[in-house]
């Protein structure tokens, strides 16, 4: 999910395994869950509720950057010449118009 062009979400002391557990926990413990960040931190393991909330805030900021066009789409190269170029541009336009819920 994270890349070098994004903020520190997915980097630092968060392992890939912890990030996956974090993402799963967010799906289980929604914003209406009492003690959400305590539950998320417990599901991740080795993180405090404050660290879980900070990681969430970074994720939200990254998503907003993507939605606002601040993170460029990769320039994928095709091996068949320009035959897929139009489709890639259409996909890029579609992705730019999408808003994540």
From Swiss-Prot:
SUPFAM superfamilies reported for this sequence: Homeodomain-like
User: Which stretches of sequence are listed as region Disordered?
Assistant: 69-101
Q: Which residues form the SANT domain?
A: 9-64
> Coiled-coil segments, which residues?
none
Describe tissue expression.
Expressed in the funiculus of ovules and in embryos. In young ovules, expression is observed in the adaxial side of the funiculus (the stalk connecting the embryo sac to the placenta). Also expressed in heart-stage embryos, in the cortex and endodermis of the hypocotyl region but not in the cotyledons, shoot and root apical meristems, provasculature or epidermis. Not detected in young seedlings, mature roots or in young floral primordia.
Q: What happens when the gene is disrupted?
A: Endosperm development arrested.
Q: Any idea where this protein resides?
A: Nucleus
Q: Name one GO molecular function term.
A: DNA-binding transcription factor activity
Q: Which UniProt keywords apply?
A: Nucleus, Transcription, Transcription regulation
Q: Name one GO cellular component term.
A: nucleus
Q: Which Gene3D superfamilies match?
A: Homeodomain-like
The UniProt entry, under InterPro entries, shows:
Homeodomain-like_sf, RADIALIS-like, SANT/Myb
Which Gene Ontology BP terms does the record give? embryo development ending in seed dormancy; gravitropism; response to red light
Domain of life, per UniProt, equals Eukaryota
Per its database record, what is this protein's job?
Answer: Probable transcription factor. Required for female gametophyte development.
Other observations noted? Assigned as a member of the MYB-related gene family, I-box-binding-like subfamily.
User: What is the protein's given name?
Assistant: Protein RADIALIS-like 2
Q: Which organism is it from?
A: Arabidopsis thaliana
Q: What lineage does the source organism belong to?
A: Eukaryota, Viridiplantae, Streptophyta, Embryophyta, Tracheophyta
